[in-house]
Amino acid sequence: MDATAIHERWSVMSNASIGQEIGVEGLTGLDVDALEISDYVDETLLDGEDLTVTMIASASCTTCICTCSCSS
């Protein structure tokens, strides 16, 4: 599975979990240290190897999204 496929899979699962866009206002008071990748990844859909790769990709994507959103 390549990085693009991993990111697309993460995006679909993340959007299904969140279900809505939150603006910068929604990030006020957000404790980024308390965020868990497992909150956004349905681990039952992945095998062991896919899960490891996806969680690593998710961590980097989540960090980027949070950083970009918070710095706006």
UniProtKB/Swiss-Prot annotation:
Keywords: Amidation, Antibiotic, Antimicrobial, Hydroxylation, Methylation, Pharmaceutical, Secreted, Thioether bond
Cross-link Thiazole-4-carboxylic acid (Ser-Cys), sequence positions: 60-61, 69-70
(Z)-2,3-didehydrobutyrine modification, residue list: 63
Location of cross-link (4S)-thiazoline-4-carboxylic acid (Thr-Cys): 63-64
Modified residues ((3S,4R)-3,4-dihydroxyisoleucine): 65
UniProt-listed GO biological process terms: defense response to bacterium
Placement of covalent cross-link Thiazole-4-carboxylic acid (Ile-Cys): 65-66
Propeptide: 1-55
Modified residue annotations for Serine amide: 72
Cross-link for Thiazole-4-carboxylic acid (Thr-Cys), residue positions: 67-68
Record carries keyword Magnesium: no
Family listed: Belongs to the thiocillin family.
Protein name: Thiostrepton
